[in-house]
Amino acid sequence: MTGKISEGNALVLKYINSKDAYSNQCRNEALFVYPYLVMNFEGNKLKTFDFIEKTDFDLTGNHLHAYMATNLYLNNQQSQKALQIASNINPSNQYLSLPFWQLEMGYANLNDLKLDAAKTALQNFIGNFKGQFYVKDAYEKLSWIAYIQGDQAKAKAYRSNVLSKGNDITDADKQALQNAKKGTWPHPILLRARLLSDGGYQQQALAILAGKTSNDFEKAADKTEFAYRLGRIYDLAGQPDQAIPFYTSAIEKGANQPEYFAARAALQIGLIYEQKGNSSLAITFFNTCLEMKNHAFKNSLDQKAKTGIQRCLRK
């Protein structure tokens, strides 16, 4: 069977909007999966969040839908909305008690630089979660909090748990483990800028980096991250033409580094040119992303690049 991504998503939406008896049987699941399909395969953020905000989701009583919305908002620089949903979930005997709500609140508060609230939530997640996923990542975030607060001893203690606790199946846990093994710490200025940017606070993040150049950083990885971070901030602020030169600099500086900055920069340039309607250049940069080896988040970045190529080829 063959078809277009947009046609497949349209069929799911048609099913959601159908009024027949059959559509009610799986409507809950279809409502859960449709925003992910639009986000991950169409690459359309505006369409995704427009659907979430205009659809009759019960984001307090339906934990499945609430998790979907929280996850998407959190991963797309809208930490305040993610935190609002996660904080207003109504407890119910119909659902298992999931520590992942604490993890999401920890992430959201950290991106707001609400460090004490983030620490409490992340500690609650670790204390109550019996699984192995995202444990390394949670411990890394706790180490960052201690590091930012100037408690180096506690930061090192949390980092030792990154090495010994949880597994490294997810990309986030792989990255946390890689960082811990290196034994180095992120530059405090770049870390604060990253967290604010991830939370959706682009102007505050830009203010932290104002007046600096890559020459202000000693480590090669920090020079690459500085270029990438500026590109990402301008990109998220809706200024793609200003983002491209910084992304290009990140590719040039970091193509052979184990960090994800260069590969992600190539992916983002591809997405920018796709939005501009220049499929040829978009494919070139998606392929640049795919060609980079042995870097963090390779699985997820490669998947996004491959999906981008498929979208461009179908246009």
Listing of model-derived features with the role each one plays in the protein:
Residues 5, 44-45, 79, 115, ...:
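TPR-repeat structural position
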Residues 2, 41-42, 76, 112, ...:
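Structural motif corresponding to the intra-repeat A-B loop/turn of tetratricopeptide repeats
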Residues 1, 22-33, 58-68, 93-104, ...:
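Generic helix N-cap/helix-start motif at coil->alpha-helix transitions
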Residues 131-141, 148, 153-157, 165, ...:
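C-terminal structural cap/anchor segments
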Residues 13-24, 50-62, 87-97, 123-133, ...:
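Solenoid-like repeat scaffolds
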Residues 36, 71, 107, 144, ...:
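Residue-level recognition of tetratricopeptide repeat
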Residues 179-187, 192-199, 283-315:
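Terminal, low-structured helical/coil segments at or just beyond the last alpha-helical repeat
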